[in-house]
Amino acid sequence: IPSYSLANEKKQNLQNIYTLLQEKKFEEGIKNLQVLSEQNDINAQLLYSKILFSGDLTPQDFENSYFWGFSALLGGKKKASNILEKLNEYLNEEQIRDITTKLREFLEKRAYEKDKRAIVQIAKIYENFTEPPDLINAYTWYNIAVAQGIKTAKSKRDEVLNSLNEKDLLDAQSLSIKLFKKINN
């Protein structure tokens, strides 16, 4: 399937969800929204995060709202940062760390299912959302992203590469090769 038709299909699905919600078929709409979110559709994730935050159509669920909002942010939805800022008032550091771990595991599973966006999202977690930044793993995932044909990851990979020493770089490259094979198996 060409990626264009897949993107078109997701847009269609999101449109169906809006229609279901307008027709007050909330349960079905929310279920479909969850399915699309689990397919790493960042537009669906942002909407789902907002709904879980507001509690208008389903009970409030701040942890899941953070999970989906964070995934959308990592996928490039900058608007998600607004919801995450609000959620920071209700969640403690430990909860956020746990959510980040769960999200990384979710994205790794997606990456092994050949989801290219997930590969970059994982790299961003390691680079920007671990304390201290885990540059070995960030490089590993950016390196895989570039090898998978994601051109936008090249500058990030090279940037992280310049902050690694020789040993760490070799370790990261070995890990990249191993994970790349696992993804493309």
Pin down the residues of each PLM region:
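Short helix-capping/linker turns of helical repeat alpha-solenoids
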Residues: 24-25, 38-42, 54-56, 75-78, ...
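Structural signature of tandem alpha-helical TPR/SEL1-like repeats
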Residues: 24-28, 59-67, 94-105, 132-137, ...
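Terminal, low-structured helical/coil segments at or just beyond the last alpha-helical repeat
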Residues: 93-113, 152-185
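Hydrophobic face of amphipathic alpha-helices that form TPR/SEL1-like repeat modules
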Residues: 15-19, 47-54, 83-90, 121-128, ...
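Alpha-helical segment of the N-proximal tetratricopeptide repeat
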Residues: 11-39, 113, 118
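Classical Sec-dependent N-terminal signal peptides that target proteins to the secretory pathway
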Residues: 1-7
